[in-house]
Amino acid sequence: MARRAPDALKDVIRDFRRDQIMDTARRLFGERGTTDVSMDEIAAEAGVARSTLYVYFANRDELLSACVQSMYDRLQDTIALVVDDGATPVARLRRLILGVLERIDESPAFFRLAMATQSTTTAAGSEAVGGALMMIGLDMIRVLHELVVAGVAAGDFRAELDPERAVVLVGQQIYGALSVRAGEPDPIPVARAADEICTFVCRGLGA
C-alpha cells in the first residue's frame, strides 16, 4: 500500500493540472469568442510549458472537445439528479431548469461560443462541439418527456397534451432562456430565473 501512495498523488496532480488547463482554455475561448486560440497562449495563461499541454491533449481540437465534454458531464450529472428525484413533476422540472442554469452560469461565455460553433459547420472544432451538444439535447429530451408524461398522469398537466410536441416546445423555451441568460452582463439571481421559466412553462402545460 505504501508504494501506491506516490502513484495516487501523481494521479491527483495530473487531474488537477488537466482541469487547470481546461479551465484556462474554456475562459480564453469564451473571452475571445472564438476557438482560434493558440496552444502557446493557453499554456502561457495556464502557467505551464507548451509541451505540458501535449502531455494531456494531442491538439487544440482535442482540448476543445474535452472542454465541451466537461460541460456535458456536469449537465448530465444535473439531469441524473432530477431523474432519481422522488419529487412531483413540477418540482423536478424546476430543479432541472435551476440545475441547467447553474451549470451555464459557471461559464456563460464558453456556452455562447459552443452554441455559435455548433451552428457554423466551418468553424474550428464544430464537429466535436456539435456531438457533445447533441448528446446534451438527447438527454434533455428524454428527461422532459418523462416529466411531461408523469405530469399528465398526476393531473398537473393537461390530459390532451401530445408529449412529443410538448417536449419540443418546452425544450425551445429552456434553450432560449439559456441563450438569453448566457448573453446578459448582469443576469437576475439564478433561483428567480428558474422560478420565472418554470412558471411560464407550467402555465402552458397546466391542467
Indicate where each model-derived feature is located.
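Basic, helix-initiating cap at the start of DNA-binding domains
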Residues: M1-R32, D36-E45, D61-S65
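Base-recognition residues in the alpha-helical recognition helix of bacterial helix-turn-helix
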Residues: G30, Y54-A58, S70
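Amphipathic alpha-helical segments used for helix-helix packing
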Residues: I104-A128
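Short hydrophobic/aromatic patch on the recognition helix
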Residues: A25, A46-F57
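Amphipathic alpha-helical packing segments from all-alpha helical-bundle domains
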Residues: D73-Q76, A80, G125-A154, E164-V168
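C-terminal peripheral helix-coil segments that are non-catalytic and often amphipathic
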Residues: M1-R4, A8, G99-E102, R142, ...
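Hydrophobic alpha-helical connector segments
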Residues: A66, A80-A109, P163, V167-V170, ...
